[in-house]
């Protein structure tokens, strides 16, 4: 404990790190304030229907990513989701389209071009999602809530246009906040904003669970203690999954330049057990919603009922299988053995016992296939843990922290942020946050 307190003191002794932490904290406060600012012309006291409809499914995921702003009809309702969607599209284009693949290999200049394209695509997605969100609002809340239409005499058309523009500006502002945090704050800004939205729900979830368990006289307190112990074990498992890597040794050839010798050292390529992050869970959740679109048809009503039973066997069985499939797919998209082999060859590196070129590509591909299997199974288990928690009587809000997207994002972003703080401490010759002085994070969401 004494060492931990000393480390916290050291963090604030470093002026640059202190400024970055304060800057990040202030921008996060701005974001959280905006999440509670309701769109002008809407009565905030009449949003119960919208909040209820955004509590589960993929829409619940969007509401979680926006920190509750989606269900509050906030000016930040769209949050960072348009930017994330655009980033995923550009990332996929980098695999399937030669032009984007070329940009990926151009280094910093190519990255800047792709970032600019991501911003423009974000605007296009916002232009689609903004009107769709306004249409959803009209369906979910009573007409009396639209004060601008009922009392100020605005037409629905102009109200929707103005509200869509405000949503666009809000989403772009959130994206700007994320970029500023990344550049001048601590951690990855976009990921940190999502994590803050998730963390904001935790106090409500834990208080609700405490209230339910302590109100029962048949061992409620004991059950609560068991739940918390199990939750800590699950968090530890999630940390292990995020940090787990398979290290592939790489030997670099010796080069003599003048009187100095370069290279000849052995390094490692860390291949992550879960290289896909949380994306397989998000894709699987989106796909599981498709049967609900046909719920009004008699022939498919039974299938829709099965797919809407989040604690049912078939829902979780299919959901888990989809997570495994999408883990393999997204890993194949994001991890490119061919590019890794070319980079190694270009820098004079090789894997001991493996010929450079095609054999290296095949070797890396085989390793990724082997390590992805346990990673995908572990990810599938974590993704269905919230449903299992609900079956055992845990409150829905608290159960969402037992696994799935919430837990993995929370763990991943915290590790990334701690890794940055760790690097600042070690550069100034202070003790790190961990005894080993090393912390592994994740590269992206």
Regions found by a protein language model. Give the residues of each.
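N-terminal cationic and glycine-rich segments that engage phosphates or anionic surfaces
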Residues: 1-104, 109-445
């Amino acid at each position: 404990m004494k060492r931990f307190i000393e480390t916290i003191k050291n963090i604030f002794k470093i002026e640059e790190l202190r400024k970055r932490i304060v800057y990040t904290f202030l921008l996060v406060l701005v974001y959280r304030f905006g999440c509670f600012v309701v769109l002008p012309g809407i009565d905030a006291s009449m949003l119960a229907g919208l909040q209820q409809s955004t509590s589960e499914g993929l829409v619940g995921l969007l509401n979680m990513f926006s920190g509750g702003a989606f269900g509050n009809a906030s000016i930040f309702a769209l949050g960072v989701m348009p930017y994330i969607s655009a980033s995923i599209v550009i990332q996929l284009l980098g695999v399937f389209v030669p032009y984007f693949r070329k940009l990926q290999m151009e280094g910093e200049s190519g990255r800047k071009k792709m970032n600019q394209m991501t911003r423009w695509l974000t605007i296009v997605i916002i232009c689609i999602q903004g009107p769709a969100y306004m249409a959803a609002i009209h369906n979910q809340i009573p007409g009396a809530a639209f004060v601008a239409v009922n009392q100020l005499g605005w037409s629905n058309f102009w109200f929707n246009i103005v509200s869509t523009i405000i949503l666009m500006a809000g989403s772009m502002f959130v994206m700007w906040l994320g970029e500023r945090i990344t550049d001048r704050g601590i951690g990855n800004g976009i990921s940190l904003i999502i994590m803050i939205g998730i963390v904001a729900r935790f106090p409500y979830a834990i208080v609700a669970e405490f209230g339910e368990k302590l109100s029962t006289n048949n061992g409620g307190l004991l059950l609560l203690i068991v739940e918390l112990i199990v939750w800590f074990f699950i968090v530890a498992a999630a940390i292990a999954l995020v940090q787990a890597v398979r290290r592939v040794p790489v030997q670099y050839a010796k080069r003599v330049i003048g009187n100095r010798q370069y290279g000849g050292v052995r390094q490692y390529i860390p291949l992550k057990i879960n290289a896909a992050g949380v994306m397989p869970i998000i894709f699987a959740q989106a796909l599981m919603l498709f049967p609900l679109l046909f719920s009004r048809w008699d022939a498919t009503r039974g299938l829709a009922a099965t797919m809407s039973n989040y604690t049912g066997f078939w829902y979780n069985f299919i959901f888990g299988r989809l997570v495994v499939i999408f883990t393999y797919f997204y890993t194949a998209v994001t991890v490119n053995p061919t590019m890794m082999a070319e980079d190694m060859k270009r820098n004079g590196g090789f894997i001991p016992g493996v010929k450079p070129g095609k054999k290296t590509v095949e070797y890396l591909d085989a390793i990724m296939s082997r390590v992805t299997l346990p990673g995908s199974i572990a990810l599938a288990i974590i993704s269905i843990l919230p449903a299992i928690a609900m079956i055992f009587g845990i409150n829905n809000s608290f159960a969402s922290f037992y696994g799935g997207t919430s837990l993995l994002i929370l763990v991943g972003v915290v590790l990334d942020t701690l890794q940055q703080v760790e690097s600042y401490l070690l550069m100034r010759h202070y003790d790190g946050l961990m005894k080993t002085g090393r912390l592994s994070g994740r590269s992206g969401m």
